[in-house]
Regions:
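Basic, nucleic-acid-binding surfaces and adjacent catalytic neighborhoods in DNA/RNA-processing proteins
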Residues: 24-42, 55, 147, 151-293
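Phosphate/anion-contacting hairpin/loop surfaces
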Residues: 71-171, 176-183, 191
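Catalytic cores of large soluble enzymes that bind and process phosphate-bearing ligands
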Residues: 2, 6, 140, 199
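A structural signal for alpha-helix termini and helix-coil/disorder junctions
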Residues: 13-16, 20, 48, 140, ...
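Gly/Gly-Pro- and Ser/Thr-rich, intrinsically disordered tail segments characteristic of DNA damage-repair
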Residues: 1-117, 125-126, 276, 288-293
Length: 293
């Protein structure tokens, strides 16, 4: 699933192209992608409207329209936006097509069909149920660190699980949570309540640094994330532990390990991140060969 850097990369690509263009026509070929209104209502709300600009809330992409309506899109697992000069370029799984006044087409493609589109009044954006669940992300200028610290330090869950909870801090996802915990040398299985405030501060600072760098390199493409004209994110070249199972740790020269916790893969260095002998005895290391697709 695209995480914050990948979503921001998509926005950075689309914004200069679609902003100030008017949506002349809309075609929807997969009704279930439209969530809180009917397909006809969706088309009525966005057709003939100028796209003012795009922004982001967590992993949600916000298309702000001139009629004070915001189209809220989520890529989910495999969603992608493409810009076509003509519809001869269409490919399988192109499900929503926006014809733009500049002669181009903004196309939403989704092989898994898990993507979502909501329509909401811009003034009521924060009342949309899906967005109300989304906490601030570490790159927001007014990020409420005290709130995040309070929720982490009272939690009985592992810090890795906590960082994936979008209601506590948004945008990290599995890749960047693994990288942040390695950067801070924190054991991913440590319960939130067992961390110190200094460790939480370190997590916050590392999150900002890693997310910012990942955006600079257009996110991480491991399997299928692409943007623009099939461009790939290059932050994969800077990953320290994620997707590095059985490879050598750049710090201590021991091997990176991979195992499951609550259904999500943890990548970590058992030495640098101080996994205990008891923890290592309980986990089942995943015998998976890491392969880029």
């Amino acid at each position: 699933m695209p995480e914050l850097p990948e979503v921001q990369t998509v926005i950075n690509y689309l914004n200069p192209i679609v902003s100030n263009q008017t949506i002349l026509d809309v075609q929807v070929y997969k009704d279930k992608l439209i969530k809180n209104v009917t397909v006809n209502q969706f088309i009525e709300q966005v057709k003939a409207q100028k796209i003012l600009n795009l922004s982001r809330k967590g992993k949600y992409i916000l298309f702000h329209l001139a009629n004070q309506i915001t189209m809220v899109a989520h890529l989910r697992m495999e969603g992608k936006f493409f810009i076509y000069d003509n519809l001869k370029l269409m490919r399988n799984h192109d499900y929503i097509i926006f014809k733009l006044s500049g002669g181009q087409f903004l196309v939403f493609n989704d092989t898994r069909q898990f993507g979502t589109f909501h329509i909401v009044k811009t003034s009521e954006l924060n009342d949309l149920k899906e967005l109300k669940k989304v906490a601030q992300d570490p790159l927001e200028a007014n990020f409420n660190f005290d709130r995040m610290a309070h929720l982490i330090l009272k939690s009985n869950k592992s810090i890795k699980t906590i960082l994936l909870d979008q209601s506590i801090v948004s945008g990290l996802g599995n890749i960047y949570a693994n990288e942040v915990l390695f950067a801070t040398r924190i054991n991913p299985l440590t319960k939130g309540k067992d961390l110190t405030i200094d460790q939480v501060k370190a997590i916050f600072q590392a999150s900002k640094k890693i997310l910012t760098k990942a955006i600079k390199y257009n996110g991480t493409t491991i399997h299928s994330f692409k943007f623009g004209n099939n461009q790939r994110g290059s932050f994969l070249d800077f990953l320290k532990v994620h997707f590095k199972a059985k490879q050598i740790c750049s710090i201590c020269l021991n091997h990176i390990i991979r195992f499951k916790d609550h259904g999500r893969s943890i990548y970590c260095c058992p030495v640098c991140q101080n996994l205990t002998a008891e923890q290592l005895a309980k986990i089942n290391l995943e015998e998976v060969e890491e392969t880029k697709l």
